[in-house]
Amino acid sequence: RNHIMGELLEQKGVRVFNSSSVTRIANNKGITYEFLKDVVPFLAVKYGNEIIESKIENKGFEYPYVIKSCSGHGGSQVFLVNNSKEEEQAVKAMNGQEYVVQQCCSDLGRDVRVYIIGNKIIKAVLRTSTESFKSNYSLGGKVQEYTLNNEEKAMVERIVDKLPLDYAGIDFTFNNGKAVFNEIEDAVGARMLYQVSDIDIVEMYIK
């Protein structure tokens, strides 16, 4: 997840998986949203002093909303903020790190991860939680196989057309029942994929 190291290797003619461009973009949520703002819908995000808006309604920042580290993974440093006190605590927990503020989706505790190899959809997995607004498998979320509809497939295809992916996960949350882009997981973990399928992701990746 070090794009500088990736760039150095690429300059020496070494093929890097994922490319340094993917590593730079996918490992900073603010940069990801800016890069994809004209590609897929997502809930409005404030990054730095700018509000990044995509083609979706409800662009305000009334409570509740989410504060999350730009570089966090696995659901770490993601906070649901319901009032000014919780906002203060969340910002303090960032300890000076870059973060984004995002309008909260309506369908909490539910998201989909789409596994990508070589720009192709391998499998989609639905994650749910009744205990937390975060549905990460590592945090106790339940998983099951998920079938993407045509609109969701089209969003994935637009993303990989804009940002080719060797191996990654694309995550979507749900707002009023519709999938909206959440983030790209560079060098994505595959534990939950093994729970819902017999796919050997390592073998596919090597091929």
Residue ranges of predicted features:
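Conserved protein-kinase catalytic-loop segment immediately C-terminal to the catalytic Asp
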Residues: V66, T173-F174
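Short, hinge-like loop/turn segments at secondary-structure boundaries
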Residues: Y33-D38, F61, S84-K85, G118-N119, ...
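Rossmann-like NAD(P)H-binding beta-loop-alpha module
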Residues: F42-Y65
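Phosphate-binding site of ATP-dependent enzymes
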Residues: S76-L163
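Conserved N-proximal alpha/beta basic substrate-recognition cap immediately N-terminal to
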Residues: R1-Y47
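Protein kinase-like catalytic core scaffold
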Residues: Y65, V100, I122-K123, A168, ...
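Conserved anion/nucleotide-ligand pocket segment
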Residues: E62-S84
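C-terminal active-site "lid" helix and adjoining low-complexity regulatory extension at the edge
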Residues: D161, L165, F174-K207
